[in-house]
């Protein structure tokens, strides 16, 4: 599933930063077991930065709307998703990566609904590179 970034310098820098995080996540997870989306390739097309990711079916918001809108999802599915999400969060913490935009839209599931992956690392950051602010946002 290709993703195209807008053609301007700020978007290119953001895309390159996201790619750096995706590569770091993949390098430390060669068996693809940590529930973070894997990027298969990156390329430029007509001055646009493009990324190709492993195929997933839909995001978690869509899956919950489709399969749990009236009564929720089964507790076993909640356990499975929670375990996989905590695995991803623990892995990102170990690599000192803060996702910074974790929401159902940025969590994807496969077509069997038994595998969950965190995606969209465009807002990710390293807490050591950030300034601490006394203000709440």
PLM regions and their residue ranges:
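The N-lobe alphaC helix and its flanking beta3-alphaC-beta4 segment of protein kinase-like domains
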Residues: 6-30
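Anionic group-transfer/hydrolysis microenvironments
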Residues: 5, 56, 122
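Conserved alphaE helix
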Residues: 34, 46-50, 55-113
């Amino acid at each position: 599933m290709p993703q195209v970034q807008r053609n301007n310098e700020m978007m290119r820098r953001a895309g390159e930063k996201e790619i750096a995080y995706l590569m770091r996540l993949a390098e430390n997870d060669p068996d693809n077991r940590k529930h973070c989306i894997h990027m298969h390739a990156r390329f430029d097309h007509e001055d646009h930065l493009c990324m190709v990711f492993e195929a997933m079916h839909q995001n978690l918001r869509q899956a919950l709307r489709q399969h749990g809108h009236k009564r929720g999802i089964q507790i076993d599915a909640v356990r499975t998703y929670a375990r996989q999400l905590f695995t991803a969060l623990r892995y990102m913490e170990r690599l000192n990566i803060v996702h910074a935009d974790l929401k159902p839209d940025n969590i994807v599931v496969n077509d069997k609904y038994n595998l969950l992956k965190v995606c969209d690392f465009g807002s990710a950051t390293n807490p050591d590179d950030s300034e601490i602010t006394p203000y709440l946002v």
